[in-house]
Structures are given as C-alpha cells and as structure tokens.
Curated annotation (Swiss-Prot):
Residues 64-117, 545-588 form the TSP type-1 domain. Belongs to the complement C6/C7/C8/C9 family. The lineage of its organism: Eukaryota, Metazoa, Chordata, Craniata, Vertebrata. InterPro entries: C8A_B_C6_EGF-like (IPR048831), EGF-like_dom (IPR000742), LDL_receptor-like_sf (IPR036055), LDLR_class-A_CS (IPR023415), LDrepeatLR_classA_rpt (IPR002172), MAC_perforin (IPR001862), MACPF (IPR020864), TSP1_rpt (IPR000884). This is Complement component C8 beta chain. Membrane attack complex (MAC) assembly is inhibited by CD59, thereby protecting self-cells from damage during complement activation. CD59 acts by binding to the beta-haipins of C8 (C8A and C8B), forming an intermolecular beta-sheet that prevents incorporation of the multiple copies of C9 required for complete formation of the osmolytic pore. MAC assembly is also inhibited by clusterin (CLU) chaperones that inhibit polymerization of C9. It comes from Oryctolagus cuniculus. The gene is C8B. Residues 120-157 form the LDL-receptor class A domain.
C-alpha cells in the first residue's frame, strides 16, 4: 500500500521542516592462450560492524572468469591493413575466483590487394590531424574549428569574430558524452560542443555571457522561484524497492537496441560509493517490520536540447568510427561501446536532487500509538527555521505533547529502542563538498540546503535524459559505407547488452545485490552481512527474494511479432521471500 502527498512552498521549506523535526537524528555511518582482467579483485563494501558467523550456505566456491574460444580471423581490412578476432565473456569471475588476466580481442597486421575506398568527399578544408571537414570561411577566425588548430595555421591575419570572452554552458561537456545505460555512467565525448561554426551571439543567463555551441538547439534556464517536494509512504520494502530503488539505479527493462522515446530519470552510477551505501543500508530492512518514508526534492536549473541533424562529432569518436572494420568483428565494436557508451543524449534536464529515506519500526510506532501521518504533521507544525527561510506555522490537528513525544523518540534513538531505525540520504548536483556534507552527516540545516541549492546552479547534474542509440550519429557525411557501419553497431549493441547484464552473475546470499564490473561480479551486501557472497552474518532464517534470470534470445518473427522470456530463478524466492517484479515475457513488433 502506498500513500503520497505533494505540496509546494516558495523555498525548500517543507523538506526542511521535516529536517528540523528530525534534526537531532544521527546518520550511521579453449585456447592455451587465455584472453586481461578488466577490473581489480573483489572488495566487499558491507558496512556491518557487529560480530558475525557464517550462514548455513557458507562461502560459495570461487567462480573463475571464462572466455569463449577465439572467433575466426576477419578478412584483411583494406584500409587499416589489419585483421581481427575476439572472444566472448562466457562467465564473469565471482567470489574471489580467477580473473581474466588477458585480452578478449586480438589485432594483427596483414596485407591485401583490395583497394581502400574510405574517403568521404570534402568540399571544404580537410583538417590535418583530425580529418574533419570544415567550411573554408572558418579558416583564420581565431577558433579551433578543426580540433587540431590546423585551420588557424599559416594565417597572415586572424579575423576574430568574437571580441568578448564568453562562458561555456554549465555541464555542457557531460552532455557531449556518450552514455552507458547499464551502469548509468558517462563515457568518452561523442559530440564536439566546443565547435561553434563561427557563431558568436551571446546568450545571457544570470548576467553571464554564454556562447552557444553549433550542436545545441536550445539551452533554457529554469526559474528557481518554486520547489516541489514529494513525500511517499511505503508499507513494505518490496513496495519501496519497486517504486524507488529500481528507478534510482536500474534500466533493465529497456530494450536498448531500439530508440527510447520518452525522457526518463538518469540513475546514479552503479559503481558509485554513494549508491552502494544506499543499497546496503536500505536492503538491511528488506524483511523487517518497517515502514519507509521517502522524501524527494528536485531542483531544475536548465533544459537542454540537441539539434536533430548535421551534428559535429567529436574528432576522437569520429576517428574511432572511421577505423572500425567493415567486416563485422564484435570485439572492435565492443571496444567502441566501452570507450564511448552506446547511446547519446538528445534532451536533458539539469539540476539537483535531494532525497532521503526514513526507515521506521512499525511495531514500535503501533505500541506508542504513532503513525507516519503524525510525523509529517509535526514536521509541518510549530517549527521555526533559519533566517534564509520564512517562518511557517501550520496547524494539522496534532497535539503539542504528541509532537514532543515524537521528537524525543527521534532524539533518543541511540539510547534505546526507538521508532527510527535509519535515515539514508542521496544527493545529486552541487559541488562535491556540499554533497559530502549532505550525504554523510546529520540532516542538513536550512543554511546548508540553501548553499547546496546555490551550488547546483553552477554545478548541475544531469537528472533527466532522452537518448538515441550511438549508431544514429553515423552518417554518410562523415563515414564511408555508413549503412554497413551502422548495421554492425546495431548488431554489436544486442550482443553487448547480453554480455554486461548482472543477470549473468551467480546469486548473492542474504539478499545481496549482484553488480557486474567488466569481467567480474561483486555483491553489494545489506548492512549486517559481509563476505564476497554476503555469507557472513549473525542473522538467522532470512527470507530470500527472487531475482530474474537473463532474457532469452528473441524468437523468430511470427505473425508480425517476436517474443523473449525470463525466469524468476536467479535465485527463486525462498522462505517467504518476495517474487520478482516485472514481466516474465516481452513482445515486439517485427
């Protein structure tokens, strides 16, 4: 069961009221030649601090990384004078198993009499090192239009069009990056947002002069006059996980080989310490009688939109795409995705998100005759905030004595068994010192929240995105045989998706969350569990929640449709654990 409330005040007052209410709460802290490890050995990040014993399952046997045998060599590429072969990751290493300390691809020189026809016609100036084709009117204009300064070489005179210094849009470098949706990470640059095509009209934001890149259609600042805060109550961890956790870090439901039509929230990097801490501490209460109060505030700073066509690619990405073999070799295209991601951002919302989860002991609340409604009401009643926030007094029918009782419960939580079990914070946007102060200390003060909001203006995070597959950037304007390269990238993306999914990991114990990092799998353990498989714990008879297996391959097209399936057996639910959420099958038109 879920209950939601949403309200708006002029400043982050509503959220801070609850912060004030809880302000005294402390936050706890095969070939004989084998194909190189992509990651270091496993380091368990569990925060458990008490004495533990090994569970009945005990430590699982180490799983060694395993690659397939080598593919056949490709034909000799007539332009690169090289041939290629690769190996697939059959099984990631796990539980301190042997890593793959060897390469999963090989390239060697070769000779061929076939002609190279890789040149793309350029009617302008061909840049010396980057190979970019630019209009001759951009020569000697004071801008590095080529990316290698060759357009500014041997100039008798520089005809500079921009006579005033102008700033770059906030986060514009990140917006030019490719994106890996499996890990929620930004990779290498695929677009050149330092290319202006001679444009020099200033764009004023907050009395600052910005120069609009050629690739950008719009960059629209958002007014910070009002903030909306949403507060939602979840009666169980399964409800909380489905509605909050999966949206925070999981994109497993996307079929990444196709366009994703709508804008969606950009999750937190799955390898970040902040997310691992969040998962570990909330997962601890997956089978306790707890209620979850989740509060979330999103601050939007700017909306970004990319031009729909005729984009200037970053020269590093362009050169890599121009070098991939025309004969399909998964290893080369896989490396392209590893370095540059597999999608790029076409629209984005920039800003910051502050969210916290208050975990309450349901039985203790019932014994004391309190509800989460009481906590919310007290948070909005009779609290005076700092000078940066105007005083707000709201009477919601809760007695003063009851509010004081709630506050005393919170204040004394470390001295006796109280209602409040934990408070876990996630912050995105703002300078790093503000993120650290918010996420790893007590609840923020009004002044600190105001500082964070100011910092978000100049250091925004990407909080929502709309994306397209990377192969959509490959056009005949830049790449010879672009249709072949595009089809190869499309095919490689489907294979890449199957190779990097955490469903390939063996189950962790104690409801640990498996994550795949390169060629190994790690377990993020709930607080109270540790070990490479989360097998060391003092807790007994813990119900095990179900997790999905990997998707099957798509069926052949029949009646205009194709289907794929998965099973809830990795592991299956045990001892009263929750079943898998989401569909067991998917169907697409074909």
């Amino acid at each position: 069961m879920k209950k939601s409330w949403t309200w708006t005040w002029r400043v982050p007052a509503e959220l801070l009221l609850l912060c004030a209410a809880l302000g005294c709460l402390c936050v706890p802290g095969s070939r004989s030649e084998r194909p190189r490890s992509l990651e270091p050995t496993v380091v368990n990040r569990s925060l458990a601090k008490s004495r533990h014993s090994r569970s009945v399952d005990a430590t699982p046997m180490p799983i060694d990384c395993e690659l397939s045998s080598w593919s056949s060599w490709t034909m000799c590429d007539p332009c690169q004078k090289k041939r290629y072969r690769h190996a697939y990751l059959l099984r990631p290493s796990q539980f301190n198993g042997e890593p793959c300390n060897f390469s999963d691809k090989e390239v060697e020189d070769c000779a061929t009499s076939r002609p190279c026809r890789s040149q793309v016609r350029c009617e302008g100036f061909v840049c010396a090192q980057t190979g970019r084709c630019v209009n001759r009117r951009l020569l000697c204009n004071g801008d590095n239009d080529c990316g290698d300064q060759s357009d500014e070489a041997n100039c008798r005179k520089i005809y500079k069009k921009c006579h005033h210094e102008m700033e770059q849009y906030w986060a514009i470098g990140s917006l030019a990056s490719g994106i890996n949706l499996f890990t929620n990470s930004l990779e290498g640059p695929v677009l050149d947002h330092r290319y202006y095509a001679g444009g020099c009209n200033p764009h004023y934001i907050l009395d600052m002069r910005f120069r609009k890149p050629y690739n950008v259609e719009s960059y629209t600042p958002q007014t910070q006059g009002k903030y909306k805060f949403a507060l939602a109550e979840y009666e169980s961890y399964s409800d909380f996980e489905r509605n909050v956790m999966e949206k925070t870090y999981s994109k497993s439901t996307f079929n990444l080989g196709f366009k994703i039509p709508s804008i969606f929230e950009f999750g937190i990097n799955t390898e970040s310490d902040q997310l691992m801490n969040y998962i570990s501490r909330t997962k601890r209460f997956s089978h306790t009688k707890s209620k979850f109060l989740h509060a979330r505030s999103a601050l939007e700073v700017a909306h970004y939109k990319l031009k729909p066509r005729n984009l200037m690619l970053h020269y590093d990405f362009l050169q890599r795409v121009q070098r991939v073999p025309l004969e399909y070799s998964y290893g080369e295209y896989r490396d392209l995705f590893r370095d540059f991601g597999h999608h790029f951002i076409t629209e984005a919302v920039l800003g910051g998100i502050y969210e916290y989860t208050l975990i309450m002991n349901k039985e203790a609340m019932e014994r004391a005759d309190y509800s989460l409604n009481d906590v919310q009401a007290c948070a909005k009643n009779d609290f005076k905030l700092g000078a940066a926030i105007e005083e707000v007094y709201v009477s919601l029918g809760v007695s003063t004595s009851k509010c004081r009782g709630i506050l005393n419960e919170i204040k004394d939580r470390n001295k006796r068994d109280t209602m409040v079990q934990d408070l876990v914070v996630l912050v995105r946007g703002g300078a790093s010192e503000h993120i650290t102060a918010l996420a790893y200390s007590d609840l923020p003060t009004a002044d600190l929240m105001q500082e964070w909001g100011d910092a978000v203006q100049y250091n925004p995070a990407i909080i929502k995105i709309k994306v397209e597959p990377l192969y959509e950037l490959v056009t005949a304007t830049d790449v010879a045989y672009s249709s072949t390269v595009k089809q190869n990238m499309r095919q490689a993306l489907e294979e890449f998706q199957g190779e990097v999914s955490p469903c390939r990991c063996a189950p962790c114990q104690g409801n640990g969350v498996p994550v795949q990092k390169g060629s190994r799998c790690d377990c993020i353990c709930p607080v109270g569990f540790q070990g490479s498989a989360c097998e060391i714990t003092s807790r007994k008879n813990v119900p095990i929640d179900g997790r999905w297996s990997c998707w099957s391959r798509w069926s052949s097209c029949s009646g205009g449709q194709k289907t794929r399936r998965r099973q809830c057996n990795n592991p299956a639910p045990q001892d009263g654990g929750s079943p898998c959420s989401g569909p067991a099958s998917e169907t697409l038109a074909c």
